[in-house]
């Protein structure tokens, strides 16, 4: 759930000793299942409770730069992390902790008769993507651009797909939901978004070899973290013990 800025800002003077037993982690929506599964183990190990704010990495970065109190930022691409780093908001450097793959999806009934990623450009196909500023939306468009003129596709394949986009979503979970509900003919998500509830309602389509970039996920403690020690502890946990929870949900080791 993406928290409103007003709630995230909290009240002046709230930071301090009371924050030593808790942290707030701003994390890409695609990390929800893995991070929520890992949180109890982190709390058991450290005694620190975790509150998550999941959403599109671009929106989370903007909230951080607007002053929303957060201890850790976990992004689904390096672009949004760099934006926060360039503003001087990181406590040290970011580290890549996981990778992910793109996959095309269509509703199980396949009303658009989409048989391949190439069909995304066919006139009349209703494509649902994340917005271009959202990591998965950027990765998808980069993949389409790599497919221009390849394997019999037109030189303007990416532009043709863009013309078919009927909705630009705020995060990858929204894309998965719309396609699983049949509110679009085709979409692009991460392979890790194929949770049982989604996988039972969609069919998957593979990108051509070499077309789809691999998503890199960086994580970092934030300079203005209310609980600096807790932030460092969570980052260390994700880079080590937390890897088993990421792998169990389909993420690739960094």
Please provide the spans of the model-predicted regions.
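Bacterial N-terminal signal peptides
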Residues: 1-12
């Amino acid at each position: 759930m993406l928290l409103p800025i007003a709630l995230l800002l909290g009240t002046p003077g709230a930071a301090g000793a009371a924050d030593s037993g808790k942290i707030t982690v701003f994390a890409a929506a695609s990390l929800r299942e893995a991070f929520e599964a890992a949180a109890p183990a982190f709390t058991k190990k450290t005694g620190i409770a975790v509150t998550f704010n999941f959403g599109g990495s671009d929106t989370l970065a903007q909230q951080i730069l607007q002053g929303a109190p957060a201890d850790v930022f976990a992004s689904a691409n390096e672009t949004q992390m760099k934006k926060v780093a360039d503003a001087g908001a990181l406590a040290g450097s970011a580290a890549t902790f996981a990778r992910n793959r793109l996959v095309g999806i269509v509703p199980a009934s396949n009303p658009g008769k989409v048989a391949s990623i190439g069909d995304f450009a066919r006139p009349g196909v209703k494509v649902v993507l994340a917005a271009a500023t959202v990591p998965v939306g950027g990765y998808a468009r980069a993949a389409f651009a790599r497919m221009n003129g390849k394997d019999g596709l037109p030189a303007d394949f990416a532009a043709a797909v863009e013309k078919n986009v009927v909705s630009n979503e705020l995060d990858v979970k929204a894309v998965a939901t719309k396609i699983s509900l049949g509110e679009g003919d085709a979409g692009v998500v991460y392979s890790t978004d194929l949770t049982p509830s989604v996988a039972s309602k969609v069919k998957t389509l593979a990108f051509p070899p070499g077309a789809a970039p691999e998503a890199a996920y960086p994580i970092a403690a934030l300079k203005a973290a209310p609980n600096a020690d807790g932030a460092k502890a969570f980052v260390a946990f994700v880079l080590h013990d937390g890897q088993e929870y990421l792998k169990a949900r389909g993420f690739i080791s960094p």
